[in-house]
Amino acid sequence: MTADDPDEGGSPRRAVPSEKGGPRSGPPGDPSLGTARMGVGVGPAPQPWPDDPRLDPELLREGDRRNVVDRYRYWSVEAIRDDLAPTRSALHVAIENLEHDLNIGSIVRTANAFNVGGVHIVGRRRWNRRGALVTDRYIDVHHRPGVSDLAEWARGHGYTMVAVDNPPDSAPLESTRLPERCVLVFGQESAGISAGLLAACQGAVRIEQYGSTRSMNVAAAAAIAMHWWSVQHR
């Protein structure tokens, strides 16, 4: 999280007990630490612990059940963020938050997977984190109170806002070269992108569909669009 979102925590939050893991038996895990693999994650690390400032003593003691890749097991949140920072992409993602949509958390989780430069929550400050599975702690999440705030940020940083929706004048995503400095903009699950936010975008792309449904799930569309940007620019 970032300092411009004080209501949601300011600087990155430390891991909470619900993220930690306790001892469980299982097949061998990381041989370098001699850990026991748990249902999810790894168990407590046997002592002596490695002399590594990136490691979190509480995670070493209790185990690590967080949704992180194996190389980040036992690392503190701050250490993971610092390690990810040099490889963050130029891509940003904006999500309209009008109805506390569950899909917002899923989009944030995908944004973490692609290590985007930032996520912008447009509208309501509080957003549905359930689908994020705490992955928002490792990326920058900004709150933009309104469309004008997002548009001003994008202009000031040289970014092009591209809506991912299916208005009549949208272009097929799969034949579109996305800008490198791009903000992919997503709306709510049922209503799509609001007219005001759509008007603030410099273009719109749609994902071609071949079935009977008018639109696909917005979280699925976000994953496809982020992947397409990554294919072009990573």
Q: What do these predicted ranges mean?
A:
Residues 1-234:
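Post-transcriptional modification and biogenesis factors for structured RNAs
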